[in-house]
Amino acid sequence: SDVYKRQVKSYRKELWFRVPSRRGLVNITGEVEKALEESGVQEGLVLVNAMNITASVFINDDEPGLHRDLEAWLEKLAPEKPYGQYRHNGYEDNADAHLKRSVMGREAVVAVTGGRLDFGTWEQIFYYEFDGRREKHVLVKIIGE
């Protein structure tokens, strides 16, 4: 049978970021689409994973008002200051970043159909940095055929 002759491909790419401010939102959809094209995968899955515990990858609409609302909502849930409100901040000042990451999650998974990311209307992939000003990376792992 033809099914047994198919070979699953695996492709890995790292996307590096240095967000100059403490918090920042980056639309990485284009970079993920480029990685998918490089992989040659036509049918499968893409995992996009923040490789730091103070950053997130998620899917949403690329609309500036929504971005401001998200920032305000996260700041209400886990305000950056006063630093002394967090037990983690004995030697660091980023407990809020860890909590925001816990709420927003680590990764996004997107189906690949016909060599393209299979999104719903308006969906885009974002990297959200909660404790920036240093280099961090995102893992893009693509599997399929």
Predicted segments with their positions:
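Structural motif
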Residues: L45-L47, S56, V109, Q124, ...
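Short amphipathic
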Residues: K9-V19
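Active-site beta-strand/loop microenvironment that shapes enzyme catalytic pockets
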Residues: G24-L70
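Short, small-residue-biased leader/transition segments that mark boundaries at the very start
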Residues: S1-Y4
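Mid-chain, well-packed structural core segment of small domains
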Residues: E71-G120
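C-terminal binding/interaction regions
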Residues: G120-E129, R133-E145
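A generic structural signal for well-ordered coil/turn residues at beta-strand boundaries
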Residues: Y11, I53, M104-R106, T113, ...
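Solvent-exposed alpha-helices and their adjacent loops that cap or buttress functional pockets
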Residues: K9, G40, R101-V103, L117-F119, ...
